[in-house]
Amino acid sequence: MAPSETQLTYASEDAFELEMPTRTLSLDEANDWLAMIAEAEGVDSPLVFKSSMSNNTEALALSKEWCIAVRKSKPTQLLLLHEMTHLLCVNKNHGTEFRTELVRLVRHYISFPHAAALHKKFIDSKLTITLFATCI
């Protein structure tokens, strides 16, 4: 059976994070960083907090509560933007809208080279995404 779109998205992000790691942040730093992003994006700031989760779950975006639960007390910037993307997107899956928004956020709040590399990982995995030039 072929991997699902979600599995391919996660695999692409994992491969990207191995090649171009993003910073790990304390919970206080994560909350401050996402507050800055939320202000720039014109949305309320989500609360980031540590929570017990299964070993195969790194984090969860809880849309109704507008918060992000993380398993580890030092999440990466990519993990935080992944979950922030879930909060910002209308579709709560890992489809084209999600990947396009994630690359846009990485571009604006981490770096252009990181965004280009993540975009390439998605394309190399045959995942659809809006053209990179329109993500910036």
Listing of model-derived features with the role each one plays in the protein:
Residues 2-71, 91-136:
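Metalloprotease/metallohydrolase-associated module, dominated by Zn2+-dependent proteases
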